[in-house]
Swiss-Prot record:
InterPro entries: PRC_barrel-like_sf (IPR011033), PRC_RimM (IPR056792), RimM (IPR011961), RimM_N (IPR002676), RimM_N_sf (IPR036976), Transl_B-barrel_sf (IPR009000). It is found in: Cytoplasm. It holds the Pfam family PRC_RimM. The keyword Chaperone applies. It comes from Acinetobacter baylyi (strain ATCC 33305 / BD413 / ADP1). This is Ribosome maturation factor RimM. Binds ribosomal protein uS19. Residues 101-182 form the PRC barrel domain. HAMAP family: Ribosome_mat_RimM (MF_00014). GO terms for cellular component: cytoplasm; ribosome.
């Protein structure tokens, strides 16, 4: 682990160091990649700690139960591992595969303004995408109200072909077939 100022501008979060595992510096790691082991294809990792940005090198990793554990270079005991708990893991976005047409990384969708329909079928601002999560059937967008949205409601809108009509990353907007009263 080394302090760094060379954090990629195009970085994307791919996981988080969750908790210490054992006495030899291993950590449980949460992965945002699919499959979860893909996070080890994108190295080096940059982690954001209380002390600032650090570059970390993965020594070893292994599946354990339903999750993953990792051993990092220069993290050799439980105390060192515990100091990293909660650190987010980032990589250069340029390392990730390009998306196909109508495919998006969640990080590209967060913060987009969501435009839906009112009772008269007029376009209205429903808020901004705050986060996304999986349900098994389809992904769900958590849309939080903003100062200029139609109301103060938080909405959970499914990412489904019948709902999501168009995504305009350049304009920072997503158009949905979703009413104010849903």
């Amino acid at each position: 682990m080394t302090p760094t100022q060379n954090v990629p501008e195009d970085r994307i979060q791919i996981g988080q160091l969750r908790s210490a595992y054992g006495l030899n510096g291993w950590l449980w790691v949460y992965s945002n990649t699919e499959p979860m082991s893909n996070m080890f294809d994108y190295l080096p990792w940059f982690i954001e700690t209380k002390a600032g940005w650090q570059t970390v090198d993965v020594k070893r990793w292994k599946p354990h139960g339903k999750g993953l554990v990792v051993s990092l270079k220069n993290v050799s005991d439980r105390n060192a591992a515990e100091s990293l708990i909660g650190s987010t893991i980032w990589v250069a976005k340029s390392q990730l595969p390009k998306t196909d047409v109508d495919e998006y990384y969640w990080s590209d969708l967060k913060g987009l303004t969501v435009l839906g329909l009112d009772e008269e079928e007029q376009e209205v601002n429903l808020g901004q995408i705050h986060e996304l999560f999986e349900t098994g059937a389809n992904d769900v967008m958590v849309v939080r109200a903003t100062a200029d949205s139609v109301d103060a409601e938080e909405r959970m809108i499914p990412w489904h072909k019948d709902v999501v009509q168009r995504v305009d990353l350049e304009a920072g907007r997503i158009y949905v077939n979703w009413g104010v009263d849903y």
